Regions:
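Short, intrinsically disordered N-terminal pre-domain segments
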Residues: 1-14, 244-246
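Surface-exposed molecular-recognition determinants
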Residues: 19, 24-28, 37-39, 43-246
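Parallel beta-helix/beta-solenoid repeats that form elongated, surface-exposed shafts/blades used
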Residues: 30-32
Length: 246
């Protein structure tokens, strides 16, 4: 086919310069966000085809895998308990929870967790249900402490020790930290790790880290957070992420 014939064939398709620029990259880059429903031009074994960004995302996910995926987030209100039930063993191996500025409505109490094996219909709250150990360092010389299931309440697993809210800045700081729960879909002793920062009732800066297991071989498919007395004060956010398994 001669050059003239090629040009004539191209002209007969009604292709515009703008469309050609989009194909060859000559158009200027912008900040238009990609969204569901958008199309992507691909070369399918020599044939130009349009596919959707959803199809592209699925394909890339099968090649890349891993990483964190947002599941849900709760802006804390004045409630007694907060539950997360977005566990999905077909997608995630483990889970990460982040706590931002979480405070109790009562001075000198801590945050705890309880597990569920029935999707959140009930939570494990019998004495002896949890084994745990945690250590914390506080502002001041040689102020290090530990707590474990031999000298504490075992109807829950602690995330923090006592948080101060009586005066500023304690009430403004709250608890900031993370919780990891590992492979809860397995019928094993499901456990995890916690760490975070808060101010105690005396206003001392405190860093606490620890670990726990549910003292029974069973899966976990929901988590409940609560306070050792009273409930949550309004404010702050708890967010759940899944660690993608493929």
């Amino acid at each position: 086919m001669s050059r003239q014939e090629k040009l004539a064939a191209l002209a007969s398709t009604g292709v515009t310069k703008t469309e050609l620029d989009n194909i060859d990259g000559g158009t200027a880059r912008g900040t238009t966000a990609i969204a569901d429903g958008d199309g992507v031009l691909i070369n399918d074994a020599g044939t130009m085809r349009m596919t959707s960004v959803e199809t592209m995302a699925t394909y890339i996910g099968t090649k890349v895998g891993g990483g964190l995926e947002f599941i849900s987030s709760t802006d804390v209100s004045a409630v007694t308990n907060i539950a997360f039930t977005g566990f999905d063993s077909s997608k995630y191996d483990s889970y990460l929870f982040t706590f931002a500025h979480i405070t109790p409505d009562t001075d000198g109490v801590g945050i705890y967790l309880r597990t569920s094996t029935d999707g959140g219909s009930s939570y494990d709250s019998t004495s002896g249900d949890y084994l745990y150990f945690s250590g914390r360092g506080q502002e001041g010389a040689n102020t290090y402490y530990r707590q474990d299931d031999s000298d504490g309440n075992t109807t829950y697993a602690p995330i923090t020790n006592t948080i101060g809210i009586a005066t500023s800045p304690e009430a403004l700081v709250g608890f900031n930290g993370t919780l990891e729960i590992l492979h809860p879909h397995l019928a094993e002793y499901t456990g995890g790790f916690t760490k975070g920062f808060f101010l105690n009732p005396a206003g001392s800066s405190t860093f606490m880290t620890g670990g726990f297991v549910r003292a029974a071989q069973s899966d976990v498919d929901a988590i409940q957070f609560g306070m050792t007395s009273g409930g949550f004060a309004a404010g702050g956010t708890i967010t759940m992420y899944g660690m993608v398994n493929s």
